[in-house]
């Protein structure tokens, strides 16, 4: 069924926008004591430095110092950082991904997930780029995002779909489909958020 296939792809694209906006909202705006933005310290890989376990430990220390509750800590790794750990860390590779929960193995108190649309930061200022902004190759790199479930909230309203089939569309004789929803995902405080940004190569 071609119509059903198109609608399904539309729904997937719709969800992708929701998820990308949510992770952008949960990433800290800039580096502060309670919203640490760290840079990776690993070996150079192309135009950036790789993520290492030491970088995740540094983020844990920053959360501990900021007195962020240990329970409910989430770390969402971008695709580059997952690849870094898979290539460098045999233990991580052996425990990679739980097909039942969708989570990667737990690391240093963080429940770990993977998402390829994490935000970008300016590596000099450690400030987050606006949603949808095009990253500059000379200064901006992608991050992995950390947050505390105790410092975040989400609310999903109902989703309404609209469909007009070609047979009842005298203007263009095309099938028209659209969706509308109300959803929000935000930090409740400017704390308990963190990011590890790929550093520029030296």
Positions of PLM-derived features:
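Residue-level signal for secondary-structure boundary elements
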Residues: 18, 22, 34, 68-71, ...
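Alpha-helical scaffold segments that mediate packing/assembly in large oligomeric complexes
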Residues: 1-66, 197-202
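Sequence/fold signature of self-assembling virion shell proteins
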Residues: 44-53, 88-202
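Short, catalytically relevant binding-site loops at active-site mouths
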Residues: 28, 80-84, 117-121
